[in-house]
Amino acid sequence: MKRDKVQTLHGEIHIPGDKSISHRSVMFGALAAGTTTVKNFLPGADCLSTIDCFRKMGVHIEQSSSDVVIHGKGIDALKEPESLLDVGNSGTTIRLMLGILAGRPFYSAVAGDESIAKRPMKRVTEPLKKMGAKIDGRAGGEFTPLSVSGASLKGIDYVSPVASAQIKSAVLLAGLQAEGTTTVTEPHKSRDHTERMLSAFGVKLSEDQTSVSIAGGQKLTAADIFVPGDISSAAFFLAAGAMVPNSRIVLKNVGLNPTRTGIIDVLQNMGAKLEIKPSADSGAEPYGDLIIETSSLKAVEIGGDIIPRLIDEIPIIALLATQAEGTTVIKDAAELKVKETNRIDTVVSELRKLGAEIEPTADGMKVYGKQTLKGGAAVSSHGDHRIGMMLGIASCITEEPIEIEHTDAIHVSYPTFFEHLNKLSKKS
């Protein structure tokens, strides 16, 4: 796809529903007794994989674009799937689902695409095995395809080596089916969508700063869920609005969960002109409107406990840093290496092609600003949706047009991304 520089970005857009919350609304609705309705669901490829997997386990789910109705009959009504549970490109689907499957009294086989086959699963299968789960796969359960044979589980106290909502959620979902109490402790608090939504479905949890406990045997009751716009998707337009001259963008109903708003902190620290208008009628998940305007930006240092709050936004933050005065340092972000691609490598390689001065480090990168990005190059998403969108925004500010390969990866989380970008830049 060929993209060229834009003069200005103006207008208002509704960011598609949050991917993390959309996945969980389907999963928990499938485990609950009663009818769960979901509004503003993200109909991206990843979340559709979650629907498909639960349909294979006998759950009746109706989906029409961003409206979903799940007719749940409780966790005990899940049936043994007759075919492979295919998660596509979705790490969230496979890791959370492993926690559910671990305690079900049936056999299941789980796999995904080439990218999933490279992603580490032992970080989830290991604690589940400690609870009594029977999980096998390539390299002793490190890689897909994985097989799960139902087992009776016992609660554990698990200290996770990394702050990962996927690990935490998988262990809590297994804990829901285990004998006794299960506790997960993390080095920093990771995103808490699972805890918020389990509470909305009637499950009691006890939480402190970095740990959460769940008692086994609790049942979920159907709930109505509104999914706010995904702040990880909004981040691309927040960056674009700050960088492109004479711009003003209004982003409606964006999720403002404090475990996800690291990008807002970074923009404010860089000196961006950002206005936040919280909504009064937020339910379990806070949301509001964000208004961004062209800003003069300064470099920042990013590391420590903010990293889990913006791990998915680092590609677009790196681009933003090319337009900030000074050297931006991103550290403590080794987790980037096990995303859809090794995002330290892909961010550095693609931005260098556009003329950026950027260096990889062992756990992040250094970006030197302020720079003019020349462009005039062919770049690739490497099959990673967030790299593809970063390059889409980069094309707005490069001197010469760029050719972006493999843009179809963007459908995973933001199918209307280029449509929205064209609307803001007044391109048809």
Swiss-Prot record:
Reactions catalysed according to its record: 3-phosphoshikimate + phosphoenolpyruvate = 5-O-(1-carboxyvinyl)-3-phosphoshikimate + phosphate
Location in the cell: Cytoplasm
Residues where phosphoenolpyruvate binds: 19, 91, 119, 166, 343, 386
Keyword presence, Lyase: no
GO MF annotation, one: 3-phosphoshikimate 1-carboxyvinyltransferase activity
Positions annotated as active site in the UniProt record: 312
BP-aspect Gene Ontology terms: amino acid biosynthetic process; aromatic amino acid family biosynthetic process; chorismate biosynthetic process
PROSITE patterns (UniProt xref): EPSP_SYNTHASE_1, EPSP_SYNTHASE_2
Coiled-coil ranges (or none): none
E.C. number: 2.5.1.19
The keyword Thylakoid is assigned to this record: no
GO cellular component, one term: cytoplasm
Function: Catalyzes the transfer of the enolpyruvyl moiety of phosphoenolpyruvate (PEP) to the 5-hydroxyl of shikimate-3-phosphate (S3P) to produce enolpyruvyl shikimate-3-phosphate and inorganic phosphate.
Subunit organization: Monomer.
UniProt record similarity statement: Belongs to the EPSP synthase family.
Protein name in the entry: 3-phosphoshikimate 1-carboxyvinyltransferase
Organism field: Bacillus subtilis (strain 168)
Encoding gene, per UniProt annotation: aroA
